Amino acid sequence: ALEYFQETDGVFDCTIEPIMEAWGFTTHDYRVPDSSELSGLLPLVDASAVSLNGDQVNLPSGVRLDLGGIAKGFTSSRVMDIFAQNGVTSGIISLGGNVQTLGRKPDGSLWRVGIQDPGDLNSMFAVVKVADEAVITSGAYQRYFEQDEVRYHHIIDPRTGYPADSGLTSVTIISPDGTLADALSTSLFIMGPEKAAAFWQQHKDKFDAIMMTDDGTVLVTSGLADRCQITSSGKVEVVS
């Protein structure tokens, strides 16, 4: 988590827990905190203040960790490692929609993983073919509450304390590294389409991405061009 804090210039911050609690996303007691409350909590959101000494984690007073942004990706990667160590050559696991594959399907073909349509949760807007990769999505439609006819989702920008308003509604990361895919699906969502595309261009050897903007445009990185099928009727752009 600390590595991704550095790599994303603080966009991924595992010390976001006080803000998440203020919004009720950790307690399910949902509410909209006022700006003064968030201003008082933001100084506690700074992963650079966390230090490691072997297996000991040192936190300043008031700083609390929320590893939800990488936990499922980390877990699925470790499960696949255990499978491989025990002679399993083909498998797929889904943890709350976080999909990780081991090898190919038993018949030798690639796994086909669908990506949920934010506008119609009963359908998919894309299908990607993968082997030995994770497919992990972060979306504004996954966890949210409504107050006074305004929707507030759970992907909080650690720089502002508010739900990210980046122009993206869904980000899917495809990578051999489930932990990376989990962390970056959140991070690129917060960055928004332009900065997310620039980040991918700097790290295209590590992952690919499928992103949907608020207006329904689908952005697909060029590494997926030959193994991604877009089924939505919206505009499609290839990021290269």
Regions found by a protein language model. Name each.
Residues 1-240:
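Mature catalytic core of soluble alpha/beta enzymes
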